[in-house]
């Protein structure tokens, strides 16, 4: 009897623990799952208000950089320091390319990996395949394919000697260096030499064949810009990560300015009228801001704290990283490093290489706290 009474407290304690465990299990079952995306993933970098402020600043900043880049060739003749064939221009351009590379690899791509490998997403398929790297690779290859196909279609559609000039002397036109890559690059100062070497095409930009060739180049460059600028702007507009948006604004301003210089030189050489020039400048300058505005509208479609936000922003960031990689290496750097200006000047080539490292290194250091 005494043994039974001594076991009573033990039994009461056991029953109490069972009830407590059942209560905890029941409360855990009714507690909603933690939010995915938003501050749960971005931490201190996630801020809808600050991100919106940066986007609203980015739209006019990128617009101004685009307009300045396109219009700069108009004044380059009177200001020697601003001429695209100068050594200082090549070094500054290399530094800007390093900034673009660093932004893509050190800021945008890591955020894409974080979003697409978040534990908030289903393990299948997001944790079993590197979607971020895959989409970045596809974006770069797709941009190359679009540029190449557009050049092919425009070349076949052009008749007479101008099409032959594009096919055989494309490597002597600086104005399309940003769009067509290594096989189509060189300095503006070598254009006349290429025309003299062609035999049947008169020297100068006033001939009919040369004008048609330059107009084909402008159309190819313009369409390529529209494709990738909208995608990158869309990725920035959809992101709520301040640490991603801040360096991306600087990188896009650099890119739009230098690519605008290339397009502006093309437009001048193509001999377009004032109305056509204005239309080309307008479309170039507004594509990236339009993409940002479109991304802002996209954020209204889904909840910022949902798995959908992680997938959408992660995929767009991955595509943006691939495009930044392509733009920096193919459109900006290959044109100069494989051209005669840097190939014939080792000191200038080393200075440009150092500028790339400084630009990319600066963005890498920023990734430590931004």
Swiss-Prot record:
Coiled coil: none annotated. GO terms for biological process: iron ion transport; zinc ion transmembrane transport. GO terms for molecular function: zinc ion transmembrane transporter activity. GO terms for cellular component: plasma membrane. The chain crosses the membrane at residues 56-76, 86-106, 131-151, 216-236, 248-268, 279-299, 310-330, 350-370. It is found in: Cell membrane. It comes from Oryza sativa subsp. japonica. Belongs to the ZIP transporter (TC 2.A.5) family. Keywords: Cell membrane, Ion transport, Iron, Iron transport, Membrane, Signal, Transmembrane, Transmembrane helix, Transport. Induction: By iron deficiency in roots. The gene is IRT2. This is Fe(2+) transport protein 2.
